[in-house]
Design a protein with these regions (language model features):
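Short, acidic/charged, Gly/Pro-enriched secondary-structure junctions
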Residues: 22, 74-76
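Short solvent-exposed loop/turn micro-motifs enriched in small/polar/acidic residues
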Residues: 14-16, 53-55, 98-100, 135
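Short, solvent-exposed secondary-structure capping/transition elements
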Residues: 2, 32-33, 80-84
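Secretory-pathway-linked proteins and extracytosolic
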Residues: 62, 66, 78-89, 93-198
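Edge strands and adjacent loops of beta-rich recognition modules
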Residues: 41-55, 83-85
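Globin-like tetrapyrrole-binding proteins
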Residues: 71
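Ligand-binding face of N-terminal immunoglobulin V-set domains in extracellular IgSF glycoproteins
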Residues: 1-15, 56-61, 75
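Solvent-exposed beta-hairpin/edge-strand motifs
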Residues: 7-39, 100-115
């Protein structure tokens, strides 16, 4: 829906906070989103049924969305627990069905960690660290804007195949991703006394 924005995240691994959200009307009037219109909900799959997982959604319900209005939000996500210990990755894709303005990704990391960056369709790159960054940090800054939109299409490819994106990872190969996944997942496949048949 045009009057809603969803931010999906894993509640076990990260925190998401909406810092600011409003509708800007065609005449320049700003209408703030009320705090009770920013809701945390369980994620649902494509047919609307609940998903048994830690996936949550911050749902922002914008007021007075009408012809000529623009919706804006600013959020902060902080991942406090890695998906794979000893590794980092993040990815964000930009739908061709939405307009984007003023999107910025800043990434700062220790130089001892090798991070690969894929910023297809974005502007930016490596920049000088800020004085507030830890000494010796490596910093990247990328921006993205998209003024045009396209109607949705049935059976279109998934965004990962064509959309502009920002992705960063400490993994060097897909085989390394697979090994890390196996290390985390395999122990959970073992039969425990709690579920073993008598």
């Amino acid at each position: 829906m045009l009057g809603e924005q969803r931010i999906t995240y894993n509640s076990t691994l990260e925190n998401v906070e909406v810092l600011e959200a409003y509708t800007l009307l065609a005449d320049g009037t700003r209408v703030n989103v009320e705090p009770d219109k920013i809701r945390t909900q369980d994620d649902v799959d494509a047919d609307g049924s609940n998903i048994y997982s830690d996936s949550k959604v911050k749902l922002i319900i914008f007021p007075k969305v009408e012809v000529g209005a623009t919706v804006y939000f600013k959020s902060r996500a902080q991942q406090h627990t890695p998906d794979f210990p000893g590794h980092f990755y993040t990815e964000n894709y930009f739908s061709p069905h939405s307009k984007y303005k003023g999107v910025t990704f800043n990434l700062t990391h220790d130089p001892a960690i090798a991070i690969g960056i894929d910023a297809q369709g974005m502007k930016g790159g490596k920049v000088e660290p800020l004085p507030s960054d830890p000494k010796g940090s490596v910093r990247y800054s990328f921006s993205f804007e998209q003024d045009t939109t396209y109607p949705t299409e049935d059976w279109r490819l998934d965004l990962v195949h064509f959309a502009p994106r920002f992705a960063a990872s400490s993994f060097k190969t897909y085989a390394e991703v697979g090994r890390s996944y196996q290390e985390r997942a395999y122990p959970k496949t073992q039969i425990t006394p709690d579920i073993q048949a008598p």
